Amino acid sequence: MNFLNKRDKAAIAQRVAQDIFDGAYVNLGIGMPTAVANHLPKGIEVVLHSENGILGMGPQPATGDEDFDLINAGKQPVTLLKGGAYFHHADSFAMMRGGHIDICVLGAYQVSVKGVFANWSTGEVGAIPAVGGAMDLAVGAKETWVMMDLLTKTGQSKVVSSCTYPLTGLACVRRIYTDLCTLSCGPDGLRLVDTVEGLSHADLVNLIGLPIQPASSAGH
């Protein structure tokens, strides 16, 4: 199926940013989640954390203003907001493990209906050798949100009944933000939050191949 209205990466990031509450401490993972820093709503204060040791991270700098000594965990140039700080990697992990992060936003290869997720290996040759800080965030953050495309390049759903890749965290994902829909997940399974225009609840169930509880006011 070809969806003309599917969200690009910037639109997914904007959708995530809409749900972040005022005053939240938020970790943005490597890859797609880093774009959330560029779409935070005006008028609220959100403190962004980066695993490599930044608190008070700002959006991407303008072209020509990059400082390559100031990068996020994905090695992308960022800015530092007033009051921001750099610190040791060990201090960063103490924040992550100690329950001080309200929300972590991570990418994933698979998320199960119960909120189990896999985001570090598909078993391919040359893949990264270990899980990294995502494991610490999955355990330490108060909520884990995932950003990803809903389908693989071959059309398989990344939302699954049970993960088949090496796991990152157990029953910790609460929201799944994709190019076609937003879902909540947990002990009661999947629930629809919204979809892109033109995608019906029935179409989404057919794509994912799993039961999805309807939302009271889902966008279609």
Where are the regions that the model predicts?
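N-terminal active-site beta-alpha-beta segment that forms phosphate/nucleotide-binding
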Residues: 1-81
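Conserved phosphate- and dinucleotide-binding cores of soluble alpha/beta proteins
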Residues: 2-11, 62-220
